[in-house]
Amino acid sequence: MSNEDTYKRLVVVTGMSGAGKSVAIQCLEDLGYFCVDNLPPILLPKFIELMNNNTESLSRVAIGIDLRGKDFFNSLQEEIQNIINLNEVLVQVLFVEASDHILVSRYKETRRTHPLQDNISLIDAIQEERKLLADLRGVATHIIDSSESKPKALRSKVIEIFGSGKDNIFTINVMSFGFKHGLPIDADIVFDVRFLPNPYYIEEMRKLTGLDPLVYDYVMKWKETEMFYQKLIDLLKFVIPGYMREGKSQVVIAIGCTGGQHRSVALSERISNELKDFFDFELHTRHRDALIEGTINEKA
């Protein structure tokens, strides 16, 4: 295959225990990779066969391998070379490491036991692991030193290496709900719009929802609605990039009115449309309680 883009992609994530392999795996998952952690190296050929037999869902795969599977670990480098020689899958090896004193500090902070720490000190276990991984580090296509990195900085490095401009690595979820049915427990930001005029008290609108033009126009015609909306949308445009910089893969914005049928639905629709035009992110809109009150709508 001459075009690199036609290859299926396999990223092998390995490196020092405690250096941040789990963070790297989670980030790759957010980038759209199918991720498997702690796969025994002996199973790599079977997994490659599975990738080749699956056209879509396994086109980009990340596999985490470390010394927890030490009985099989010695064969890892050989298995990787065999896969490269097959020329069927584009193989990249990400090696995550950190300095000895940083790893010691992290283990003490988390109170976890190093996988090689059998009757030896923590620092001896770390140094032994570094020796065992030396050859594998030598064949790595990418090496990240996380010694001076917080998790969000490590995520940024992984995105820089494996992401692309077309990868939707951040998702905006806009949800309408009714306070009488309870707060959405997964919301990051909640706004209360019960102070706006309520279409429920107008007979011809009572059984409609904010998706209906009659209700939508009624909610939007008020001066206080427009003032609130402009302030709200400016705030969201300011804070959403901050959520991404902090390493979050998504943000859930919840707009609530009394029943989740009229005002919150109309505002959620307008907010979704503007954010979708403003940001180059994946966006989903869901009206949680409109089914309870009347109708429901969910869209991407």
Curated annotation (Swiss-Prot):
Keyword presence, Metal-binding: no
UniProt superkingdom: Bacteria
Keywords: ATP-binding, GTP-binding, Nucleotide-binding
GO molecular function: ATP binding; GTP binding
Entry keyword annotation includes rRNA-binding: no
Record: residues binding GTP: D66, L67, R68, G69
Residues that coordinate or bind ATP: G15, M16, S17, G18, A19, G20, K21, S22
SUPFAM superfamilies (alphabetical): P-loop containing nucleoside triphosphate hydrolases (SSF52540)
Family note: Belongs to the RapZ-like family.
Biological function: Displays ATPase and GTPase activities.
Record NCBIfam families: PRK05416.1
Protein name listed in UniProt: Nucleotide-binding protein MCCL_0516
